[in-house]
């Protein structure tokens, strides 16, 4: 059994630490005469990046981008607004959180015999 869950929107303006990193499920299902089964799964970490544009029309950031972790760099992070105003969410915390997330996926893949 494989379970991915989401308790919110793909992108949000929430300031809670747990909402600033997310993931996109990658699941391979094989279907044949025996039935359907999961033959592979993984997850790509996603980062929500907040920027201020030229004109402020709300109290929120007006440029919000979701990056795959593989395309998110320290330079991008340092030039943006890490944590959307949450002082507890800094660059080091983000890397720690991503490492924990990756370890959970790795352990699930190991238990499934995929690593």
Language-model-detected regions and their locations in the chain:
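Conserved beta-sheet core of the metallophosphoesterase superfamily
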Residues: 1-25
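A short C-terminal boundary segment appended to hydrolase-like catalytic domains
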Residues: 20-115
